[in-house]
Amino acid sequence: MAKMPETTFADLSLADKTAVKKSSIEARRFSDVSTCSFSSTCFTGSSDEEDVSPKDNHQRNSAGGTDFCVKSISKSAFGRREIEIAESEMPGIMTLRKRAKDEKPLKGANIVGCTHVNAQSAVLIETLVQLGATVRWAACNIYSTQNAVAAALAEAGIPIFAWRGETEEEFWWCLDRAIYSDGWQPNLILDDGGDATHLMLKKYPDYFKAIRGIVEESVTGVHRLYMLSKGGKLTVPAINVNDSVTKNKFDTFYTCRDSILDSLKRTTDIMFGGKQVVICGYGDVGKGCAQSLKGQGCIVYVTEVDPICALQAAMDGFRVVRLNEVIRTVDVVVTATGNKNVITRDHMNRMKNGCILCNMGHSCSEIDVNGLHTPELTWERVRSQVDHIRWPDGRMIILLAEGRLVNLSCSTISSFVVSVASSTQALALIELFSAPGRYKSDVYLLPKKMDEYVASLHLATFDAHLTELTDEQSKFMGLNKAGPFKANYYRY
């Protein structure tokens, strides 16, 4: 792991009026927004909209702009309201926007982004623009986009290519449109899963040579970066924000702890008390899921390959098992490993009738969904993102979000914890852009000082007051009174 040099930063419109013709419709739709956030289980638009691919529906925003592709630009007013609600719960990124917008630290930065497109990510995108960057954006997941939010970004003049329910072909088309545009060339990548990085490296190698740096926020994407580095193919510096303290210990853990319950409730109406659940993986995602479900009265089992994580699970009160020991009896299976084929067709053949199966990891390959597309099995879509899959003997399992990331496909997430991660991403982009040549072609972690700065941006929300070291104490501990307060090897 390369050591990252010390940072010097911060020493540190109107919608189409034909969309809403009656006040009663307007009230109902705004009510839908406030309660559902245009997530997968809620607003989907009219049947006409569902039948037409956005690729074939040429639209203009109120300024006449056409450099975008979203489901329906007419929903921009609803999306703007969602973004404003998120802003009120994202103190860190909003404070960063206020403090740095006059300096324009990203002036000249051309950022291509491939992340989830929801209200929280929209706050980050618009912050990057206010800090001086030009951006082009696509979604990293075909089911997590909030269509109204994408419309609001398009209305604001941001080139955004994303809608909920993209096909695989449309996904890559959108990402290609985000990367390539006449007269525009990216010099920074903000990635979630590594798809933008790999598409650019494969299809636009000349573009990739001009990249100043990559910021990656997911376990899957970070793994892909390290594989590139190991193979000598990573020719630009990259920052792994997934393993920064503020991302890993706050966004990853707390977001998953809250959203797993929301996802399961919205899609299945399950009562948790007494249900047997197996969590595959006990990293920060698995820890959050296990703790949350245990708190609701579930009997929780954990599977792990890492003896350290397994010991943590055991001492947290969970029984550590092999999947084959419990697969016939559990009511819910949750994957949280980032690995491949964690749940195989053989596992699914042995699940009990009515077993709920979902994935909380970024990778869509944790569950062997392709193995379920065989002639003898019957698929029935019973709700948005809820499929009943029936075996010839009448047994049925419930698959959520087709094995993709369930919390962002089937529910909403906490804006506050996303603010922590978004602040980290913004600072990482600023650092890479403002210090060309400082970093070699390697994968870096954020310095402790930057992590502490991000945390400090969020303390005022809780009226939290930090204790200050005396001169005697700082000398005794060998610390600067202004931080950093922990060594890089410290594990929180």
From Swiss-Prot:
This is Adenosylhomocysteinase-like 2. Binds 1 NAD(+) per subunit. PROSITE patterns: ADOHCYASE_1, ADOHCYASE_2. Might play a role in the regulation of methionine metabolism. InterPro entries: Adenosylhomocyst_ase-like_sf, Adenosylhomocysteinase-like, Ado_hCys_hydrolase_NAD-bd, NAD(P)-bd_dom_sf, S-Ado-L-homoCys_hydrolase_CS. The keyword Ribosomal protein does not apply. Belongs to the adenosylhomocysteinase family. It comes from Drosophila melanogaster. The keyword NAD applies. One of its GO terms (cellular component) is cytosol. One of its GO terms (biological process) is one-carbon metabolic process. Its cofactor is NAD(+). It comes from the Eukaryota. Substrate binds at D192, E217, K247, D251. Gene3D superfamilies: Adenosylhomocysteinase-like, NAD(P)-binding Rossmann-like Domain. Residues 43-64 are annotated as: Disordered. Pfam families: AdoHcyase (PF05221), AdoHcyase_NAD (PF00670). Disruption phenotype: RNAi-mediated knockdown results in extended lifespan with increased fecundity and suppression of age-related decreased climbing activity and intestinal integrity. Does not affect oxidative stress resistance. RNAi-mediated knockdown in fat body or neurons does not show any phenotype. Simultaneous knockdown of AhcyL1 in intestine results in extended life span. Keywords: NAD, One-carbon metabolism. NAD(+) binds at residues 218-220, 283-288, 304, 360-362, 407, 486-490.
